[in-house]
């Protein structure tokens, strides 16, 4: 499976993410072992990193954060998410499609 995968039915993007919490800034770093490495400033405490990741991705894709689905990895750094019908495809992610 690729780090970023276009899904036709239902329409959207599936992301495999390696999360780096408590980073100095929010950014998409690049590929890390066939996953998209995402650095965020939120700490990995009481689900704060997951909530912040969803908020960060919702801004990038211009979708409501409630529409993004965390499919796997709620308590791990390795996560799989589904972004339904993104309104914008960020250039940092477009290159990995």
UniProtKB/Swiss-Prot annotation:
The record's listing under Pfam families reads: DUF167
Q: Fetch the SUPFAM superfamilies from UniProt.
A: YggU-like
Identify the GO cellular component terms for this protein. Answer: cytoplasm
Family to which the UniProt record says this protein belongs: Belongs to the UPF0235 family.
The cross-references to PANTHER family, in alphabetical order and at most eight, read: UPF0235 PROTEIN C15ORF40 (PTHR13420:SF7)
Q: What NCBIfam families does UniProt report for this protein, alphabetically?
A: DUF167 family protein, PRK05090.1
**Can you say what this protein is called?**
UPF0235 protein HD_0778
Q: Which organism is it from?
A: Haemophilus ducreyi (strain 35000HP / ATCC 700724)
């Amino acid at each position: 499976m690729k780090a970023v995968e276009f899904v036709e039915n239902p329409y959207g993007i599936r992301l495999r993410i390696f999360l780096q919490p408590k980073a100095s800034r929010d950014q998409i770093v690049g590929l890390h072992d066939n996953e998209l490495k995402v650095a965020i400033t939120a700490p990995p405490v009481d689900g704060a990193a997951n909530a912040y990741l969803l908020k960060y991705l919702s801004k990038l894709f211009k979708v409501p954060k409630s529409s993004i689905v965390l499919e796997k990895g709620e308590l791990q750094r390795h996560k799989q998410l589904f972004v339904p019908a993104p309104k914008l495809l960020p250039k940092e992610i477009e290159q990995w499609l």
